[in-house]
């Protein structure tokens, strides 16, 4: 199950999410300058997130024995090569993306988290959800950024599912503090990611000027995915 909603009408959704056999990816595109400012890239942030996410799903599933950090480094290199002749990839505002991905492996569910999107493990034995995120640099045009990602393996014992969420979706708990993490997981597992995003939007609609929750973006792109394992 997955859902995504742009934060600004009339502006492309810069989140990207997709899934394939035994794997899923979620990216949150970003840049360091305001919209419409020069980034050195003629394609834009939404294109970069989509291109990198598509490439990562392909590399992660084509070579299941390759660690996810290696799959990400390969995907970054592929996307770099797609536009290095048309865009200035040394520009300080070149498009970037947070990255999360999970893949089924014999030992459990392998995960990778780069920057501030989240991977959440949902256990069915009473344990609270395990939240995995990383605050290092985002992916840009340098494959070595993959080495900064948090990676590991979630054991399958007692695991009901895993969730991927962009920071626009986790605002409901991180910024607004309206739901604790266990309730976030319950909502997306039992009612779907779209329900969670609607709750985020309802909170934002109730604070249109950012007085209750001061924030740089009144609404951000919000994306969530839940992968049922049992």
Predicted segments with their positions:
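PP2C/PPM-type serine/threonine phosphatase catalytic domain
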Residues: 1-230
């Amino acid at each position: 199950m997955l859902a995504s909603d742009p934060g600004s009408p009339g502006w492309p959704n810069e989140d990207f999410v997709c899934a394939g056999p035994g794997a899923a990816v979620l990216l949150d595109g970003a840049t360091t300058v305001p919209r419409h400012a020069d980034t050195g890239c003629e394609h834009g942030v939404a294109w970069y997130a989509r291109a990198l996410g598509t490439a990562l799903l392909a590399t992660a599933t084509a070579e299941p024995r390759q660690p996810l950090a290696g799959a990400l480094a390969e995907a970054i290199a592929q996307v770099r090569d797609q536009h290095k002749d048309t865009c200035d990839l040394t520009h300080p505002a070149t498009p970037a993306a947070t990255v999360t991905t999970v893949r089924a492996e014999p030992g459990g569910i392998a995960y990778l988290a780069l920057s501030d999107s989240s991977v959440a493990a949902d256990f069915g034995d009473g344990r609270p959800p395990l939240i995995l995120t990383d605050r290092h640099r985002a992916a840009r045009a340098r494959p070595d950024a993959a080495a900064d990602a948090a990676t590991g393996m979630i054991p399958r014992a007692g695991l009901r599912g895993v969730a991927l969420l962009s920071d626009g979706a986790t605002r409901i708990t991180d910024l607004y503090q309206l739901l604790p993490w266990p309730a976030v997981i319950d909502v997306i597992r039992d009612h779907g990611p779209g329900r969670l995003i609607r709750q985020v939007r309802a909170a934002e609609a109730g604070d249109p000027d950012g007085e209750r929750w001061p924030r740089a973006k009144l609404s951000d792109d919000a994306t969530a995915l839940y992968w049922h394992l049992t």
